[in-house]
A protein has these predicted regions:
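Short hydrophobic beta-strand element within catalytic cores of glycosyltransferases
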Residues: 346-354
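A charged, aromatic-enriched C-terminal amphipathic alpha-helix characteristic of glycosyltransferases
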Residues: 223, 257, 393-423, 429
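Nucleotide-activated donor-binding/catalytic signature segment of Leloir-type glycosyltransferases, i.e.
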Residues: 126, 244, 287-312, 322
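Conserved donor-binding/catalytic core segment of Leloir-type glycosyltransferases
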Residues: 179, 214, 219-221, 241-267, ...
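N-terminal subdomain of nucleotide-sugar transferases
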Residues: 1-63
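Conserved acidic donor-binding segment of nucleotide-sugar-dependent glycosyltransferases
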Residues: 354, 366-377, 385-391
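Acidic donor-binding loop of glycosyltransferase active sites
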Residues: 318-333, 350
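Donor nucleotide-sugar binding/catalytic pocket of nucleotide-sugar-dependent glycosyltransferases
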Residues: 139-142, 166-231
Length: 429
């Protein structure tokens, strides 16, 4: 093998940038740490951008996606063939590329974020690679990020689709290492498996209980803690904002994020008289929520930003008087961790106001103002408490404690804990 050939490879299969999703950021963060931990070839294998657009996923502006470090390659395999089954064609492209990466002689760790379809793609590629007779040295990690269970498996349980649920569990448990993004997610996995077992006499729950570990999402703390404060005022001024001068929502604009409750709660608060509300993000509910805001009693105090890049996001979080994510369970989505909440706590500024939905308590600990789900009046009270009744010294003390708690989710800490189990030869620099 030529000296220039890689010696250790990490492959991450995920919906990557420009998708607005915490797990696209997690993939980036794991990749960046891997380059410092002895992996000299890191591949993020994902979907072509037109496919992401066609799926209706919220996407960042392409020119706003930050570059990756040397040694990290983003691959977007083209579809295979021209028959009229688009999903199969693109899936075939991804599986085919993974087979090539698994059979070129480089020892590889392959990690999938989302079981459906990414863990399935990895499993299919490993089976093909080994059947080829070519040397194959692959260790697999499957990460259940939440919607795998809250959407796919739960639907299978509720609609008695045994085969679909069995496929997800079998694929998941067939990986070398199984992890979930929170204890809440693992509990959901076990609960769903128990429902399948009770109905069909299978034994998925016991295997999930024994084999699934917790690996929290990896977050680049430096992006939020090493903020250039000299730029803060200038960045905010371009948006017509000032430091400590607005309430912020920054996430995907969907029903499950509780933006409707935030708009109503803000309109009912006294804090509206002191600071405006900024809703930053894109998503399918944006038009309806813009209309809701326009019809509210404080329409002139609510602004929407749909073009925030990763760099500006940090400043918006740091400069906010309060950050609100009023998540609520929906059939299509439950907040299984709360990456944006951790990012806000790392950035500093005013307090986080959120709900105890899903895995959010694991993300925030005792460092957030918790309000009931779907309760705008409680949001109004929390905003008034945080903005009108808390001294600057109190807020600074709370912000420091929140940042200290959030550091456990730093990407280096998460990567090292995960790979201590997966690949003990990986040593911290």
């Amino acid at each position: 093998m030529p000296l220039s050939s890689p010696t250790r490879r990490l492959v991450i299969v995920v919906r990557a940038d420009p998708v607005i999703c915490g797990h696209s950021g997690e993939a980036r963060n794991l990749a960046e740490v891997a380059i410092t931990r002895g992996f000299d070839d890191v591949r993020i294998v994902t979907w072509p951008i037109p496919t992401l657009q066609a799926a209706g996923l919220p996407l960042k502006p392409l020119d706003a996606v930050l570059p990756y470090s040397d040694g990290i390659t983003v691959e977007r395999p083209d579809p295979v063939g021209d028959y009229k089954v688009p999903d199969a064609r693109f899936y075939g492209g991804i599986v085919g590329r993974l087979v090539e990466l698994f059979t070129d002689g480089v020892p590889t760790v392959a990690m999938s974020l989302y079981l459906t379809p990414h863990a399935t793609a990895v499993a299919d590629a490993v089976a093909v690679a080994r059947a080829s007779g070519l040397p194959t040295d692959v260790t697999t990690i499957a990460e259940a990020v939440g919607s795998d269970i809250t959407n796919v498996v739960r639907t299978s349980v509720e609609e008695q689709l045994f085969g679909a649920a069995a496929q997800v569990f079998t694929t998941y448990l067939g990986q070398d290492h199984c992890v979930a993004v929170s204890q809440f997610t693992k509990d959901l996995i076990v609960e769903s498996a128990e429902a399948i077992d009770a109905r069909h006499g299978t034994a998925f729950a016991a295997m999930c209980r024994a084999r699934v570990d917790i690996s929290y999402p990896a977050i680049d703390s430096r992006q939020f803690t090493d903020l250039d404060r000299s730029r803060l005022d200038a960045v905010l001024a371009r948006r017509g904002l000032r430091d400590d001068g607005y309430v912020l929502f920054l996430s995907r604009v969907t029903k499950a994020k509780g933006v409707d409750d935030l708009i109503d709660g803000y309109a009912a608060s006294h804090a509206r008289e002191r600071v405006p509300l900024v809703i930053a993000g894109t998503g399918p509910e944006a038009p309806a929520l813009r209309a809701r805001a326009a019809a509210s009693s404080c329409a002139d105090r609510i602004v929407f930003f749909d073009d925030v890049d990763d760099d500006e996001k940090t400043f918006l979080m740091a400069g906010s008087t309060a950050y609100v994510l009023a998540s609520k369970p929906r059939p299509e989505f439950v907040e299984t961790f709360g990456i944006a909440l951790v990012e806000k706590m790392l950035a500093g500024g005013g307090p986080v106001i959120t709900t105890a939905t899903g895995g959010i308590p694991e993300a925030v600990g005792d460092h957030a103002l918790i309000v009931p789900v779907a309760d705008p009046m409680s949001i109004a009270q929390a905003l008034d408490d945080a903005i009108m009744r808390t001294s600057p010294a109190e807020r600074a003390q709370r912000a420091a404690a929140a940042r200290e708690f959030a550091m456990q989710f730093d990407r280096i800490n998460v990567f090292d804990r995960l790979f201590a189990r997966v690949d003990p030869t990986t040593a911290a620099a």
